[in-house]
Structure formats: structure tokens, C-alpha cells
Swiss-Prot record:
Belongs to the KRTAP type 28 family. Keywords: Keratin, Repeat. The lineage of its organism: Eukaryota, Metazoa, Chordata, Craniata, Vertebrata. Human have a similar number of genes as other primates despite the relative hairlessness of humans. It comes from Homo sapiens (Human). Residues 4-104 are annotated as: 19 X 2 AA repeats of CG. In the hair cortex, hair keratin intermediate filaments are embedded in an interfilamentous matrix, consisting of hair keratin-associated proteins (KRTAP), which are essential for the formation of a rigid and resistant hair shaft through their extensive disulfide bond cross-linking with abundant cysteine residues of hair keratins. The matrix proteins include the high-sulfur and high-glycine-tyrosine keratins. One of its GO terms (cellular component) is intermediate filament. This is Small cysteine and glycine repeat-containing protein 2.
Amino acid sequence: MGCCGCGGCGGCGGRCGGCGGGCGGGCGGGCGGGCGGGCGGGCGGGCGGGCGGSCGSCTTCRCYRVGCCSSCCPCCRGCCGGCCSTPVICCCRRTCHSCGCGCGKGCCQQKCCCQKQCCC
């Protein structure tokens, strides 16, 4: 399960380390702001120009472009589960699997998708 790094994400890289259970909470806000612009254009360091499955790991391929589906990060399948309307950081925490209301089972930007208005 990934934490918050986007390759060139400034605020979170060092602290995330092994991407364990405590990563989602510890890096939430800073990573969202730091990665938004840089990752939105190309899904982070490992994805090149597309999102077609030639990505390295979920830690190097964490952001979706507009219209870019979750095939970009295999370990994010079932988390964001599809295309996002805006570039976001995919939250791949186990706690999100219990989210089954509103717009679906998944989460974006470190929050579980249990609302009518949702990015996924």
C-alpha cells in the first residue's frame, strides 16, 4: 500500500519511507498540495506521458491525469477504481475498503468517498 510520495513531491518524501499504516495520516495535507501540479501532467516519475501500465510502483506513480484510469497504478485498483475528473492523489489505505456509501467504494485525497460529491 502506498503512502504519499509522487517522486518529486517535496513535503513528504523523507517521512513516508516504507509506506506503512501511519503514512496516510502523517503526510496527508502537505503531499496533496505539493504534488498536485507536478504529478497532474504525467502521473509522477515512472509513468512517462501515458498511463498505460508501464509504471514502476505505486510510490512512483501516484497521481492521475484527467481521464487517466487506475490501470496506471495496479496497487490502486479498487481504491479509486476508475477515472478521476481532476488530478488527485490516490489513497490506497486499507481503511478505504470499508467505504460503501455515496459515490462508491474508494477514496481520494486521503478521504473516504462517502459523500454525494466526490472526485472519483
